[in-house]
Amino acid sequence: MNDIDKHKKETQTESKNDLNNTTITQNNVSDDCQNQDKINSLKQKILEIKKHISEVKLREQAEIENINKNTKNKIKIIIDTQLENFFRNLIPIIDSLKNIRKDINKYNNIKDNNMIQGIPLILKSLLTVTEKFGLKINNKKGKLFDPKLHTTIPNENCKNINEYYVSEIIQDGYTFHEKIIRKAIVKLSKDKKT
């Protein structure tokens, strides 16, 4: 083989090698692009999963807060119901102590007894404690008659009862956290200052 042929052959071999290298490089670039697409796709999926996990955590936290809030409300309702029932049973005892106090004031000869003098103090202490727990007495004279808070004695003959005022409290009324436990029994008058 002569030098020209030899050179031609080398050039052809180099061209083939260059062509092969170009093909390999193109394949590598193509593979790299495909790999980059896969990586980007996986990164996107990871972001979506993280977002989903974050949303689930927020929903779970909100649900836990709602459960806690509902539980606290239910506990408050149970406690208030029990207190209300307790006060309903206690009110007749308070009435009895008030009646005893009235009787003590009527009869001077029993006022001197130390044990008898303690009854008004017991009553005052009892009313203070019950008020701290939400029991309120409805016993104000001079207020406009309110059928939600008051009941009249059966023989009251008033034509338009809502225009009358409370002149006398026969029996105190009670509310517990704005709920009426017992209406006050009252006498009425047309005059506010009675």
UniProtKB/Swiss-Prot annotation:
GO terms for molecular function: adenyl-nucleotide exchange factor activity; protein homodimerization activity; protein-folding chaperone binding; unfolded protein binding. GO terms for biological process: protein folding. Residues 1-29 are annotated as: Disordered. The keyword Heme does not apply. Residues 1-17 have a biased composition (Basic and acidic residues). It holds the Pfam family GrpE. It is found in: Cytoplasm. It comes from the Bacteria. Residues 18-29 have a biased composition (Polar residues). The keyword Cell membrane does not apply. InterPro entries: GrpE, GrpE_coiled_coil, GrpE_head. Keywords: Chaperone, Cytoplasm, Stress response. One of its GO terms (cellular component) is cytoplasm. Coiled coil: none annotated. Participates actively in the response to hyperosmotic and heat shock by preventing the aggregation of stress-denatured proteins, in association with DnaK and GrpE. It is the nucleotide exchange factor for DnaK and may function as a thermosensor. Unfolded proteins bind initially to DnaJ; upon interaction with the DnaJ-bound protein, DnaK hydrolyzes its bound ATP, resulting in the formation of a stable complex. GrpE releases ADP from DnaK; ATP binding to DnaK triggers the release of the substrate protein, thus completing the reaction cycle. Homodimer. Belongs to the GrpE family. This is Protein GrpE 2. It comes from Buchnera aphidicola subsp. Baizongia pistaciae (strain Bp). The gene is grpE2.
